[in-house]
Every structure is written in C-alpha cells, then in structure tokens.
UniProtKB/Swiss-Prot annotation:
Catalyzes the NADPH-dependent rearrangement and reduction of 1-deoxy-D-xylulose-5-phosphate (DXP) to 2-C-methyl-D-erythritol 4-phosphate (MEP). PANTHER family: 1-DEOXY-D-XYLULOSE 5-PHOSPHATE REDUCTOISOMERASE, 1-DEOXY-D-XYLULOSE 5-PHOSPHATE REDUCTOISOMERASE, CHLOROPLASTIC. The lineage of its organism: Bacteria, Pseudomonadati, Pseudomonadota, Gammaproteobacteria, Moraxellales. This is 1-deoxy-D-xylulose 5-phosphate reductoisomerase. HAMAP family: DXP_reductoisom (MF_00183). Mn(2+) binds at residues 151, 153, 231. Pathway: Isoprenoid biosynthesis; isopentenyl diphosphate biosynthesis via DXP pathway; isopentenyl diphosphate from 1-deoxy-D-xylulose 5-phosphate: step 1/6.
Length: 399
C-alpha cells in the first residue's frame, strides 16, 4: 500500500528533489496534494505527471491555473487558495506525509497544522520552527506527530544521535552520552572575501552557492551565514539543547554534513555528496532506507577535508541568531522577519549585502522581546518586525 504525500512548495528546489525521489518509488508513494506560489506553468507540468487530487495556489493565481488546466485537458483536480488551502491539504485525513518546504514565515501555519494532525512532517522550512520553537515541539508531542529534519545538517545530526534521542527529556542539556553538536557550514561563496569585497557583492553573485543548488532566499542566507544562524536555532529546538552546546564549524567541501560529539571522546559524523535527495529519502523512509540515484561518496577523490571557525566579524548574522536564541521569547521571530525583509530588499538591489545584518540588528534593538505565548502573538510580532525593518530600509534609502 502506498503512502500519500502532500508537498508544500512543490516548485522549489526541495519540492523538485522530493518529486524526483517519489518518481523513483511509485510503488511506495503517491502525490495527494501540492502547493506553489508563483511558477504556475511548472506546476501544471507537475500535475500532468503526478496527478495530485488537490492543488493550492495564491488567490490571484487561480484564474491562470484553471486556464492552463483547461488548455492541457487536466481535470479532476481540486484547486484551493491561500493559507486556508495550505492548512487544509497539510492536515487532510488522506495525507500520510507532509513535506514542509515553503520558504519563510508563510510556511508556519500549514506546518503547524500538519503537526497537529499527527502527520509525518518532513521539515525543510526552518523558519517555521525558528518562529514557533517549543510551541511546535509541544504540539508534535501532544498529537504524536513525527517531525523529521530535512535540512542536510539536521538530518545528519539526527542520524548521528542515539536512535531514541528525540524521546529523551527536553531539558536543554545534552542527553544519553551526547556532549556537543557540531553544526557544519560551507562558509558560502564569500568565505575568503575581505570586508571591503563584501560591500560590493551583487545579488547575482550571492545566489551562486559553491556546493548546493538552492533558491534565492536560502542562497543569500547562506552567503551571510544567517542560514547557519537559523539552523542553530532550529537545532536547539529539534534536539532540545542549549545554544552553547552547539558549535558552528566551517567545512568548505560540504562532505561532512554535521557531527555529534560524545562524552567518551567519540565524534560521529554523517558524510555524503551534497545532494538534497539523500536527506529527503532518509526522512521519507526512516527508519528504513530508500534507493536513490545519488552517487556514493568516493573518499579517494578528496585529498583532505578542511575545517575552520566562522569569522563573525565579516559575517555578524551568525552571532545575531545566537543572541536571539539566547534571549528566547519572540527574539527569533523578530530576527527571522527582519532578515526576510532585508534579503528581499537586497535581491531588489535596494540595499547592499553588508546592510542585511544591519537591518536585522536594528529591528532586534528597536522591538521589545516578550514571551512567545501563542501562535497569534508570534504572528503579530512577525508583522510588526517586518514593518520596522521596511521603515528602516526606507529611511536608509532616503538619507
């Protein structure tokens, strides 16, 4: 019997890699529902091949989608709109597995809906957990959802931890013999740039990652090291560990995806070629394994693997994220919201590359940090933080 899959963000890089794996295993998985934000022509091609029962797009894209469906003689697919539609498919009774791959805060509510519906949730949307933190993790426990990490680093940590680690008490301290998590980072395309060179970075250059094929937003986050900062926060929540037990290690080759150190001196690492199909396949089938077309790692190709500490002077975003996690409450929500606005402004060439962390720092300083008591207060703070960041950028440009 096949398992039914819902893919939130099907036209993005994670969504495409997920389809690749599902297409290789039609005897195990079927696509029940998908969502897309803007690439409607690509969505139609996906629907022709995988024939989902339900599709969700923004309200303003429904007419375009239905026109293309009619032209391609595609029928028997329900079309839903907006956040309500996303929540509906993520929590649908016919869905077994939800791939949460919507980028940014927009993925929070549908991801939480999937968790509250007790689904197997493959978490690629790190921002959802950065914002909701323990609310999301408590919901997973209350509703017996299986929350499995898809980010290569968190998937590597998951594979390197004791098999029952997620069932251990959530104390913020390492459990079951674990002493530390080593979160690896490629360092991004500007690892060896000077501060002066970073001032002149363009969006085109920032979107060219040396090792991974990714969307624009995550590529820029990787270049600023904010992506690693968000992943640090995600790791703290997923594995219930305080931020000072998580060390970021720059590893330019992206072969070791992360490591776990133990009290007996052991260090366990998960290694592999940088291909998102590997962690996706792992999360889909865990505790079993799926065949993929990812080549096995050839160790003879690598004469050496390099490691170094991150330069937080050149890349202050990492420390901003660590400070937000340390502060707790709504600070991570403020951090994430301001970063999304700043990255969007950079991609539109409204601010420079080195201005991104400055916008984030200003917004964190401007807003009061209070307890994250509910999803409603998280969403309210997200909205306010975006407004503050936008106003700061607007003022900056007028100076």
């Amino acid at each position: 019997m096949t398992q039914s899959v819902c893919i939130l963000g099907v036209t993005g890089s994670i969504g495409q890699s997920t389809l690749k794996i599902l297409g290789q295993h039609p005897d195990k998985y079927s696509v029940f529902a998908v969502s897309a934000h803007s690439r409607i022509s690509e969505l139609v091609e996906i629907c022709k091949q995988f024939r989902p029962k339900v599709v969700v797009v923004p309200e303003q894209k429904i007419a375009e989608l239905k026109t293309l469906f009619a032209q391609q003689n595609i029928s028997a697919i329900d079309v839903l709109a907006g956040q309500e539609g996303l929540v509906d498919i993520a929590s649908h009774t016919d869905v077994d597995i939800v791939m949460a791959a919507i980028v940014g805060a927009a993925g929070l509510l549908p991801t939480l809906a999937a968790v509250k519906a007790g689904k197997r949730v493959l978490l690629a949307n790190k921002e959802a957990l950065v914002m909701s933190g323990e609310i999301m993790m408590q919901a997973a426990r209350d509703h017996q959802a299986l929350l499995l990490p898809v980010d290569s680093e968190h998937n590597a940590i998951f594979q390197s931890l004791p098999h029952n680690y997620l069932q251990a008490d959530r104390t913020g301290q390492p459990q079951l013999g674990v002493s530390k998590i080593l979160l690896t980072a490629s360092g991004g395309p500007f690892l060896n740039h000077s501060l002066e060179q970073l001032v002149h970075v363009t969006p085109q250059k920032a979107c060219k990652h040396p090792n991974w094929s990714m969307g624009q937003k995550i590529s820029v986050d990787s270049a600023t090291l904010m992506n690693k900062g968000l992943e640090l926060i995600e790791a703290c929540h997923l594995f219930s560990i305080s931020e000072h037990f998580v060390t970021v290690v720059v590893h330019p080759q992206s072969i070791i995806h992360s490591m776990v150190q133990y009290v007996d001196g052991s260090t366990l690492a998960q290694m592999g070629n940088p291909d998102m199909c590997t962690p996706i396949a792992h999360a889909l089938a865990w505790p079993e394994r799926l065949q993929t077309n990812v080549p096995a790692l050839d160790l003879f190709e690598y004469s050496q693997l390099n490691f170094q500490a991150p330069d937080t002077q050149k890349f202050p975003a990492l420390n901003l994220a660590r400070q937000a996690m340390r502060a707790g409450g709504l600070a991570p929500t403020i951090l994430n919201a301001a970063n999304e606005i700043a990255v969007e402004a950079f991609l539109m060439e409204r601010i420079g590359f080195t201005s991104i962390p400055q916008v984030v720092e200003h917004t964190l300083e401007k807003l009061e940090n209070t307890a994250a008591e509910s999803i409603e207060c998280i969403l309210d703070k997200d909205k306010v933080a975006r407004s503050v960041a936008q106003q700061y950028i607007k003022y900056w440009r007028l100076k």
